[in-house]
Amino acid sequence: KSYWLRLESGELTKEQVTVGRFRTLFEELGIIHVAPEQVNADYQRELGNVFFYMEDAEELVTQLKEKGYRQYVVTNGVNSTQASKMKLSGLDKIMDGVFVSELMGYPKPRKEYFDACFAAMPGVTRGECILVGDSLTSDMRGAQNAGVASCWFNPTGRAKDVEVRTDYEIRRLEELLAILEPSKK
């Protein structure tokens, strides 16, 4: 079971995941004079200094903002890294909020994580939400646990390898508009 899956199931903490993956790698490669904690700190710092938009992403989130849609980021990522990426990419000015699991007290896909998210979004009901994500285990299962609609972003068309409900599936982000505004197809 991968480190991230073990985080999702509550078996590991975020630090055990982020440091443990380097510790395991170094053990497998026989590297003994490198501190996985320091490598992880350096990695997280540098990871926060780069970003890229997936095709159609910047245009889509900007268009949705202009149309009045409220948009939130839900992530199991590292808080400092996510905050840096949000600012660097300009998404901090587009998104209405960011919910990082380490600050919420629970990882995606736990129901408690989403309960905490909804508690921080006054006036937002589950019935008006859709979770768009690329992970079957954290995003689609999370949507199911949260009681919201789900849209699996599956750009490569891979087969489902996990039994989980997906309400929609898209290959390109621009396809989301037809789901949100079906009468304007």
What function would you assign to each model-found segment?
Residues E28, K67, A120-V124:
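Alpha-helix C-cap/termination motif
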Residues K1-E55:
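N-terminal helical cap/lid subdomain that shapes the substrate entry/recognition surface
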Residues T62, Y72, G77-K185:
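Asp-based, Mg2+/Mn2+-dependent phosphohydrolase catalytic module
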Residues G10, G48-N49, R70-Q71, G127-E128:
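A generic structural signal for short
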Residues D56-G68:
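Catalytic-core regions built around general acid/base machinery
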Residues K1-Y3, E37-A41, V61-T62, I94, ...:
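A short alpha-helix capping/helix-coil boundary motif
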Residues D42-E46, K67, V78-T81:
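Conserved acidic, metal-coordinating active-site core of Asp-based
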